[in-house]
């Protein structure tokens, strides 16, 4: 399947076994968002809430932007930067739950909820962190499916 098995643990505390399976051809409930003119899909199962984004509530810890609108503050991912696009409108924050804790995805708009058929990433895109696949949406557009767990891993490794 192309997944991973991660083993870890601490002496006296136990062993952690993490089985990571890739998104395969499946129907996935998502929240479609827009960022820098592109359609992005966020898996609904990971969404905690939506908030209005206010740049005044961003604090920096080193190179990591944090959203202070929640307690504790959470790391932010500006998806226009992830896409390599010019700065977007940055109106909304999608707070998601990941294996490493909560984080915020900053987007321009919400397009709505949609169940989409996931197409696994092709060879060119397979190694891109944060990319979980693609889908043709109901209106015929291509939506990039985000993998919030990998986005959070990118921030921690940066």
Language model features: what each stretch is:
Residues 1-158:
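Glycine/threonine-rich ATP-lid/beta-loop region of ATP-binding domains
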């Amino acid at each position: 399947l192309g997944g991973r098995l991660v083993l870890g643990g601490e002496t006296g505390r136990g062993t952690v076994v993490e089985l990571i399976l890739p998104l395969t051809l499946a129907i996935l409930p998502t929240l479609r968002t827009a960022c820098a003119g592109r359609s992005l899909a966020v898996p609904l199962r990971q969404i905690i809430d939506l908030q209005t984004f206010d740049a005044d509530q961003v604090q920096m810890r080193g190179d990591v932007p944090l959203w202070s609108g929640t307690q504790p503050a959470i790391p932010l991912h500006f998806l226009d930067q992830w896409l390599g696009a010019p700065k977007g409108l940055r109106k909304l924050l999608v707070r998601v739950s990941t294996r490493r804790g909560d984080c915020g995805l900053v987007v321009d708009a919400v397009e709505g909820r949609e169940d989409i058929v996931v197409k696994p990433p092709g060879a060119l895109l397979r190694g891109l962190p944060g990319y979980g696949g693609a889908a043709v949406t109901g209106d015929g557009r291509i939506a990039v499916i985000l993998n919030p767990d990998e986005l959070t891993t990118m921030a921690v490794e940066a």
